[in-house]
């Protein structure tokens, strides 16, 4: 996910443009709208943010622009299904390109957080993850419960794509703040490390954590 307007730490769009033009000419970037009100809350706002941040070199599919669909969650503690952007079901493969960083509630933002939050649609799915019974405050959920819910959302997507999904974490400009904080993100103090790639999401995120700590 690309973060808010002019976010200082996101993956440079020129890197992704070169990758797409060289190796993924038929690819589209996929996004969903946010649950909180910001630069990506509505599809119109989101497309303007994409333009400001330079993501205009290939098609961008805002997955929940045309509605939602449900993916099953197998063996879930919190969910039996997860609401994702409707258009996600139109794809037969997924490259999960993630800017690895910190996250106030999730501990860190890697491939798991990118998919779990990033594929859930902006109104229903993200609400299922962020809110608890009896509260409309998205921040009242405990960190442990939020992380479990994110993981279950992620599992629904990973199970859907099966062998046709791969994970790439970019360990660069790693603030303790999520990219959703945009220009308000805390200053970067961690050295740039490199890029981690795997077809195993747990391996990708664990290797990233190990390299940072």
What is each residue range found by the language model?
Residues 3-213:
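Extended, low-polarity segments enriched in aliphatic/aromatic residues
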């Amino acid at each position: 996910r690309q973060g808010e307007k002019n976010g200082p730490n996101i993956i440079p769009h020129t890197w992704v443009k070169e990758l797409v033009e060289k190796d993924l000419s038929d690819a589209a970037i996929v996004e969903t709208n946010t649950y909180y009100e910001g630069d990506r809350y509505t599809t119109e706002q989101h497309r303007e943010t994409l333009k400001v941040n330079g993501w205009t070199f290939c098609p961008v599919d805002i997955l929940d622009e045309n509605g939602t669909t449900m993916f099953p969650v197998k063996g879930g503690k919190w969910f039996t299904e997860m609401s994702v952007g409707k258009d996600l079901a139109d794809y037969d493969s997924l490259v999960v390109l993630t800017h690895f960083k910190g996250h106030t509630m999730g501990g860190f933002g890697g491939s798991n957080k990118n998919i779990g939050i990033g594929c859930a649609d902006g109104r229903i799915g993200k609400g299922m993850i962020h809110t608890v019974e009896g509260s409309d405050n998205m921040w009242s959920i405990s960190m442990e419960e939020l992380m479990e819910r994110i993981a279950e959302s992620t599992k629904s997507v990973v199970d859907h794509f099966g062998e046709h999904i791969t994970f790439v974490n970019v360990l660069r400009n790693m603030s303790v703040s999520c990219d959703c904080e945009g220009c308000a993100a805390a200053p970067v103090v961690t050295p740039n490390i490199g890029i981690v790639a795997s077809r195993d999401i747990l391996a990708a995120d664990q290797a990233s954590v190990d390299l940072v700590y």
